[in-house]
Amino acid sequence: MDVTIQHPWFKRPLGPFYPSRLFDQFFGEGLFEYDLLPFLSSTISPYYRQSLFRTVLDSGVSEVRSDRDKFVIFLDVKHFSPEDLTVKVQEDFVEIHGKHNERQDDHGYISREFHRRYRLPSNVDQSALSCSLSADGMLTFSGPKVQSGLDAGHSERAIPVSREEKPSSAPSS
């Protein structure tokens, strides 16, 4: 008995009456031309999502660097002002929270909120932590590391966010 193996491209019926991916799990991402034309979207594999890379880039990508003498977090928060951001250290974690109320943009009204939590290395001097926001929207949280025999000072405290007028020197990933 011969069994025909079909490529995923041919598993979806073609036609204007077949439901497209308009109501799938990517509901909040917005619509693209291939979402509105079911014939075009079904000629591409149904498991292929063209906008995933764009979504990752727009989601506030962060970079953590921990070298021998310094710990640094770079976080893209270009849609937030320093007043919208709260940075605090609690025990061995830094928590960064951003929230802004409804604002008008090119497509209507939008509100945003995020919460990030990072574990601090045990040898970071928590009394010398700093946080700044560059003109291009890059939040930089940094702290020096201490020698392993010294106390790093673990307690809860808020870190003020200062604004810089120059763009960030963090490399884009």
From Swiss-Prot:
Q: Which residues bind Zn(2+) 1?
A: H100, E102
Does the keyword Cytoplasm feature in the UniProt annotation?
yes
Modified positions (Deamidated asparagine) in chain numbering: N101, N123
What does the entry's PTM section describe?
A: Acetylation at Lys-70 may increase chaperone activity. Undergoes age-dependent proteolytical cleavage at the C-terminus.
Q: Which residues carry this modification: Deamidated glutamine?
A: Q6, Q50, Q90, Q147
The record's Pfam families line, in alphabetical order, gives: Crystallin, HSP20
N6-acetyllysine found at: K70, K99
Q: Where is this region: Disordered?
A: 145-173
Q: Which family does it belong to?
A: Belongs to the small heat shock protein (HSP20) family.
What is the name listed in the Swiss-Prot or TrEMBL entry for this protein? Alpha-crystallin A chain
Organism placement in taxonomy: Eukaryota, Metazoa, Chordata, Craniata, Vertebrata
